[in-house]
Every structure is written in structure tokens, then in C-alpha cells.
Curated annotation (Swiss-Prot):
Pfam families: UPF0240. This is NADH dehydrogenase [ubiquinone] 1 alpha subcomplex assembly factor 4. Disulfide bonds: none annotated. Belongs to the NDUFAF4 family.
Length: 175
């Protein structure tokens, strides 16, 4: 009910208000900068016919303007475009290596990516056997780029727990 009242108030005397707005005097142009004002006055005094050309309405241009027809359509919303692109999946997949940790139900992994379990495994293998698990071999094995593997090996390390016995106390030996 409130929408009907609001619509009636909004549309009340709409045509008269529109006509009044159209017939209202247009705002005057902004004042010119003093440095250009002298140049304009000089040009107007040397060429008085320009003043008449500026104020004259061109009937030919007005008739062409009346023939202009504009047909517009709403653009496709960006949400629809994003939805269409989000549905596409990468075409190449590979199966995950070693299913010893089935914490997550990963069916396939896009080429060029690895799972967390695989990342920890390859970091541990490289740490334990750096001669056999080189960056080149890891890149071939997991279908990764060489530069990404080098960065992974350089900046990421596996979690280690080291327990140091307190100084001054001897560690309790196990029986």
C-alpha cells in the first residue's frame, strides 16, 4: 500500500513539472580566465562576423539533429559474465599422488598445481634426499614449472619440532 501512495505522490503533476524544468532558463557559462579574455576580445574586434556565426542557429544542422534516432540496449551485467567464466574448469587434470592421507576428498588436481599433502611430501623428500629429489625432478614429477619449484624449495620448509632439555637439569632416560 505504501508503494502505491509513494508512486501517486511521485507522479503527481509530472508533465507540468517536466515542462517547467525544460522552459527554465539555462545556467550561464562559467566566467573566462582573465588571460584568455583579452585574446577573445581581440579576435572578436578583428573579426566581427564570428559573433554572428556563434549566435546564429543553423537550420541544416537542426534538421539533421531531428533525424537522429538513438536505439540503446542494456549492457550485459558483469555478474552474468563472471558466472559464465566461473563454470569453466581447466581442461587438463592429473590424479593426486599417494593416497595415504585421505583427509580431503580430492578427486583431481589441475596441472601446474599441487595439494597440501603433496607439497609437504615433496618438501620432506627434498630435505631428506636432496641428490635424488632435485628441483628438476620434482617439476617433472608433479607437472610444475621449474621457477615455481625453485621458489617453493627456497622459501618453504616443513614443520620441525625440536625439544631442548633445560640447562642444569639432566634429561630423564627412558627405561
Amino acid at each position: 500500500m505504501g508503494a502505491a501512495v509513494a508512486r501517486a505522490v511521485r507522479n503527481f503533476n509530472l508533465e507540468n513539472r517536466a515542462e517547467r524544468e525544460i522552459s527554465r532558463m539555462k545556467p550561464s557559462p562559467a566566467p573566462r580566465h582573465p588571460s584568455t579574455k583579452n585574446l577573445l576580445l581581440e579576435q572578436m574586434s578583428s573579426h566581427p562576423e564570428i559573433k554572428g556565426e556563434i549566435d546564429r542557429k543553423d537550420d541544416k544542422l537542426l534538421s539533421l539533429l531531428k533525424d537522429v534516432y538513438v536505439d540503446s540496449q542494456d549492457p550485459v551485467s558483469s555478474l552474468q559474465v563472471k558466472d559464465a567464466t566461473a563454470r569453466q574448469k581447466p581442461k587438463e587434470f592429473r590424479l593426486p599422488k599417494d593416497h595415504q592421507f585421505d583427509m580431503m576428498d580430492v578427486k583431481n588436481i589441475p596441472k601446474g598445481k599441487i595439494s597440501i599433502v603433496e607439497a609437504l611430501t615433496l618438501l620432506n623428500n627434498h630435505k631428506l634426499y636432496p641428490d635424488t629429489w632435485t628441483a628438476k625432478k620434482i617439476a617433472e614429477e608433479y607437472h610444475l614449472e621449474q621457477q615455481d619449484v625453485n621458489s617453493l624449495l627456497k622459501y618453504f620448509v616443513t614443520f620441525e619440532v625440536k625439544i631442548f632439555p633445560p640447562e642444569g637439569k639432566k634429561a630423564i632416560e627412558s627405561k
